[in-house]
Amino acid sequence: MSFPFKPVLLAAIVSQTFPAFAADPVPQAHQDLNEVKVIGGRKAQKLGEEKVRRQALDKQMVSDESDLVRYDPGISVVEGGRSGSNGFTIRGVDKDRVAINVDGLAQAESRSSEAFQELFGAYGNFNANRNTSEPENFSEVTINKGADSLKSGSGALGGAVNYKTKSASDYVSEEKPYHLGIKGGYIGRNSQKFSSITAAGTWLGLDALMVYTRRFGKETKNNSDAADTVITDNKQSWNPNAGSTNYGSRGVARSKPDPQDWVNKSTLFKLGYNFNDKNRIGWIYEDSRTDRTTTELSNMWAANWKGEALGDTRSRQDISYRKRIGFEYKNQLDKGPWDSLNLHYDRQTIDMSTWTWDLPTDYASNGVNSDVYHMFRNIRQKNTQFGADAEKQIDFSKLVWAMQYGLGGSQNDNDNRDHSYWVRLYDPKYQTSNNQELTMLVESSSKNRFAYWNNTFQFGDSSQYRLNAGLRYDNSSSKAKDNPNYTPAIRGQIPYLGSERKHSGFSYGLGLDWKFTPRLNLLAKYSTGFRAPTSDETWLLFPHPDFYLKANPNLKAETAKNFELGLAGSGKAGNFKFSGFQTRYRDFIELTYMGVSSDNPNSPNYAPISDGTALVSSPVWQNQNRSSAWAKGLEFNGTWNLDSIGLPQGTHAGINLSYIKGKAKQTNGQETPINALSPWSAVYNLGYDAPSKRWGINAYLTHTAAKKPSDTVHSSDDLNNPWPFAKHSKAYTLFDLTGYVNLGKYFTLRAGAYNIGNKKYYTWESLRSIREFGTVNRVDNKTHAGIERFTSPGRSYNFTLEAKF
């Protein structure tokens, strides 16, 4: 048997061990089990769903998305360059193909289409990532793996990450009318310091919650020595050991991360009033801003081939801003069409912006007359969403029928603001040129309407069978908007884009939970997902004779079908879940070469330009629905309470592993590798939580296999060669140690040491983020000098101190 399947063999052995343990279904106090809804007297087992509660977020000292999924091998974070992460990777798809929602509110789409990256992304002028969220604002995070648009809507092809914000009821009640929590800490990998305050109270039916968090830090450290790097140009070889002190400090061969300072401020405020036990209104306000200032020393134009300063020094300020205001009304009925009803309305604005300025090398000699060029790029996404969600449970003599149903809609606008100008270096308010406001991105608006009905039936002796069946219908439309600030070439294309474009379709979900013994459950699941084309996939255009990109309003939605089968068990000795899955994707949207242009209006390669004529013999590109794909794999996770074999109470062990493989199928029938598939990984855990709950310690061993070059593809234009940087992917094993101690009644100290062995390694997500063209996120294409800039952090330490009153 080949090595990658050894963890699967281990999983099978462990799964056969659990049924031998005693059948007491009550979990031990130290277990972190999934939250499950109880109907008909027993808990639900769910495939592909994991909940991370506030207690676990605190215990793991989660400060960002990477910490959230650190010990979940089935999900990873997409590298987004200097401005942070760009969503998640689940089951072979990433970015906009994994839905991200906060309280059901969809978060920003990225500008990550292949066309955008070809034209703009490689030069770093846009902050085109998906926005991130403040972990201290959340009471729990639900990670759904596998297609699941029934719950999460558009984008849930590979899965979804759903955040739920804190509420006053998480902390206060009639018996405890107030709560104050204060937390501070240090994150070693990026020299981050943070503080957070959570305050809640209730009085005469009125309750309020406030969470304020501030973080500031520097660039994420790597683990590089770069001592053996030699870079070669066309004429000669330059050896850094032969005498250049500048070597590696600038340009693509730089071995250290670019200097960066960043600050994040986040506020969450909730106010609610209970008229009585049956009626409640609520209001929410969220505000979050992250500013990252980077000196871009690794920019391709920052140095000559020796690493010596070449010209101006480029700096960037990436700004991510999110604001949300929402209202809700909740009602409960003893009899009627619902047991509970939630009406909600939210307005959200997300700004992703980048300031760019170049510090000239001769600024000192020019004195007060030195000028600086400023460039500003802003992508704004405004979203208004409303909905009604209801739940109803009907108890029959031998059957419990629980249903969830509702409807809703949203209005979305994608706007841009781009301008550039010259200012005095020593007086930036003094402009020395006109403000040029021209935008190259087509703005758009869209709307969506949906309705869903989800049912759970539980029947049989001791509620032995549990059957889920759900249906959802979505209808969306999109259209391009005019803007007087479009470049003449762009504005001339607007009449050719046509009228509003529509997408509609159904999403389904079926599930079975059969408790065939007191300790074992057989689980099955079928679900579907879809993703409507993003604004830049549909409307992005670039009428240039060297690269003519046509918009495509006729794109179809991408779709996915997910099949899953699993076995789950629980007892006094612990719990486990073992599952296999297969997902099939269709109509992937890809940038496609259409051939040379034509001046025939009836030709698909018709290439009009602003003066009313058309280009002839220019290369034409367009986003098209082309390939399909499949992914299948195995997942196992389990917890073993070792006091069941005589070890001290509170001792426990765990394992969590994921193995996945898949291929993309091209239009010519050729099957090719999928770069977004992560190599198999396993996490082993051994820990102890004192029965007194005063202290605990956990050790984690994470092993990740190499991504074989043969399992990668160079690009959509070169399907027969591997990704050139895949050869740097090697297997690695990391050892982490975390612990906590409760200092009296009110204080908790937590600490962690990560990568204790100081292992030098590259994650696959980091290697596949390297660009072969453009000016940012580059290494030397020929020698790969600068590759060590992409190593992961070495040994680092975290600690937090929390007080709760």
Ranges and model annotations:
Residues 110, 223, 530, 581-587, ...:
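C-terminal beta-signal and adjacent terminal beta-strands/loops
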Residues 120-125, 135-145, 149-233, 262-265:
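Outer-membrane beta-barrel translocator/receptor signature
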Residues 402-404, 459-461, 476, 582-584, ...:
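Gram-negative outer-membrane beta-barrel transporters
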